[in-house]
Amino acid sequence: MSSFTHFNDQGRAKMVDISDKKATVRTAIACSSIVVTKEIYDKISHNEIGKGDVLAVAQIAGIMAAKRTSDIIPMCHPLLLKGVDVSFDWKQSEEQYRLLIEVKVKTEGSTGVEMEALTAASATALTVYDMCKAVDKGMIIGETYLLEKTGGKSGDYTRNS
């Protein structure tokens, strides 16, 4: 079992020294979702939310969040990201509509981009909530999870279904 790396010899928080780690291409894919009513789905689909184009704004928020992850996650290294892609897909069941959010992040560096992908997925869902809460505050933000990561010393990872 791996040990926690963000503690020093005194058991206090530290930022891990990555200066000896090899720079490699690293990717991460994270997912989240938000469940909305048919009314919100229709308003998003027809661009009728008063604050603007919900998916465009949420997409930009996700990209911005990935770029600023080290500002809000204390032990996260600031990274030069090579790419961030936020995509959406709708799934319907009865009168509930689930907006699936997938974020792909890529870099070439000494540490992974899992936190950037997870932060971006979360911020994207939160932005949808913020933009639509005037219509219905009962939206439900779903699980946020790492789907896949590649590169680095720990190797590749793919979430089991």
From Swiss-Prot:
Q: In which pathway does it act?
A: Cofactor biosynthesis; molybdopterin biosynthesis
Q: Which domain of life does this protein belong to?
A: Bacteria
Q: Which CDD domains does the UniProt entry name for this protein?
A: MoaC_PE
GO biological process assignments: Mo-molybdopterin cofactor biosynthetic process
The molecular function terms in GO held by this entry are: cyclic pyranopterin monophosphate synthase activity
Q: What class of enzyme is it?
A: lyase
Q: Please give the family membership noted in the entry.
A: Belongs to the MoaC family.
Q: What does this protein do?
A: Catalyzes the conversion of (8S)-3',8-cyclo-7,8-dihydroguanosine 5'-triphosphate to cyclic pyranopterin monophosphate (cPMP).
Description of how the protein assembles with itself and partners: Homohexamer; trimer of dimers.
Q: What is this protein called?
A: Cyclic pyranopterin monophosphate synthase
- This protein's species is Bacillus cereus (strain ATCC 14579 / DSM 31 / CCUG 7414 / JCM 2152 / NBRC 15305 / NCIMB 9373 / NCTC 2599 / NRRL B-3711)
Gene encoding it? moaC
